[in-house]
Amino acid sequence: MSRSPRKTSKSAGLQLGRAVAWPATPDAAQIDRVPNPQAGTDYLVRFTAPEFTSLCPVTGQPDFAHLVIDYAPGAWLVESKSLKLYLASFRNHGGFHEDCTVSIGKRIAAEIKPKWLRIGGYWYPRGGIPIDVFWQTGKLPKNVWVPDQGVATYRGRG
């Protein structure tokens, strides 16, 4: 059975299915949304970005994080290619760990208006101190199962 593509409120501007240049900055990046075909069902979507990078705003040195984004969608889903491009736009962005993590969560929440969203940013040590940053919206819907984010506490090589 063949399905035709669904129209979205932004369908003309979707990045999916076409060549797109890497956005120069997070503000320039577009996060696309597509209709949720299961909008009447409470469930969880997880995106994991184990190789997220940004730049220290003071030294310009690269910072690395393992991001886990969980959300209970409402009417919209995040289109994953656009999310990949958005996250990649941080590669040349100077921002503190806390700001990068919370900004990503807020931006996604603003674009898709999920029932619930949380982001965990597990940053690798710089100066010997790992920084973990967590942010979420509201309360989780009752019947949604949320597994552990699966990122172990940083233990170094010991």
UniProtKB/Swiss-Prot annotation:
Binding-site list for substrate: V78, E79, S80, H97, E98
GO terms for biological process, alphabetical: queuosine biosynthetic process; tRNA modification
Compartment(s) where it occurs, according to its Swiss-Prot or TrEMBL record: Cytoplasm
CC annotations in GO: cytoplasm
Pfam name, any one: QueF
Gene Ontology molecular-function annotations: preQ1 synthase activity
Known EC number: 1.7.1.13
Keywords, in A-Z order: Cytoplasm, NADP, Oxidoreductase, Queuosine biosynthesis
Active site: C56 (thioimide intermediate), D63 (proton donor)
Gene3D superfamilies documented for this protein: 3.30.1130.10
Annotated InterPro entries: GTP-CH-I_C/QueF, NADPH_dep_7-cyano-7-deazaG_red, QueF, QueF_type1
Pathway: tRNA modification; tRNA-queuosine biosynthesis
Domain of life of the native organism: Bacteria
Catalytic activity: 7-aminomethyl-7-carbaguanine + 2 NADP(+) = 7-cyano-7-deazaguanine + 2 NADPH + 3 H(+)
Main function: Catalyzes the NADPH-dependent reduction of 7-cyano-7-deazaguanine (preQ0) to 7-aminomethyl-7-deazaguanine (preQ1).
Family designation: Belongs to the GTP cyclohydrolase I family. QueF type 1 subfamily.
Record protein name field: NADPH-dependent 7-cyano-7-deazaguanine reductase
Species: Rhodopseudomonas palustris (strain HaA2)
